[in-house]
Amino acid sequence: MFHCNGWCFPWTVAARAGVNVCLRRVDAKAIFDAIRQHGVTHYCGAPIVHGLLVNAPAALKEGLPTGVKAMVAGAAPPASMIEGMEQMGFDLTHVYGLTEVYGPATVCAKHAAWDQLDIGERARLNARQGVRYHLQRAAQVLNPDTMQPVPQDGETMGEIMFRGNIAMKGYLKNPQATQDAFRGGWF
């Protein structure tokens, strides 16, 4: 229940009086059965999990509910994955996070107008990140040498940095790594 599996979800689901469904292994049949049997409405997974579902035999996908919300993290979803998820009636959202900032830390905020675009353009837009998750105080792309924001031109490289009360306090018994990671007050 951690890597690319929405560690925030167990708490969110409990807060909403929902039910968590956990599987012992990643298996398309087991996932689809759980969605049908338990009425799963939201789930998280690494790209390989979504790819497994998209490429599963059609017979396994029969009777799936539509409107299931899915999060993908670890890599931008390719056009074929977005298209396959849409064909199953699932809504895929790309998020980014890491253990140190209790992901998801940023989310690709989709726009309704994107629904009218072709799959290639939707995939390009869905690959983007940058809207900070509401629990983060700040997220910004900075030049790590100058600690200044980089131009928002889609070309200039920088590092995404975070501030907020859900950023870790530091690395256990490693003050030097903590100092390096929080240079300038940003993680």
Annotate each language-model stretch with its function:
Residues 2, 29, 33-36, 47-69, ...:
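Adenylate-forming
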Residues 2, 10, 21, 29, ...:
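Nucleotide phosphate-binding site architecture
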Residues 2-41, 56:
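Conserved AMP-binding/adenylation subdomain of ANL enzymes
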Residues 18, 68-70, 77-95, 99-186:
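Conserved AMP-binding/adenylate-forming
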Residues 24, 46-47, 74, 164:
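Helix N-cap/beta->alpha junction signal
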Residues 38-41, 60-64, 109-114:
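Short, hinge-like loop/turn segments at secondary-structure boundaries
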Residues 41-42, 69:
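Short, Asp-centered acidic motifs that coordinate Mg2+ and/or phosphate
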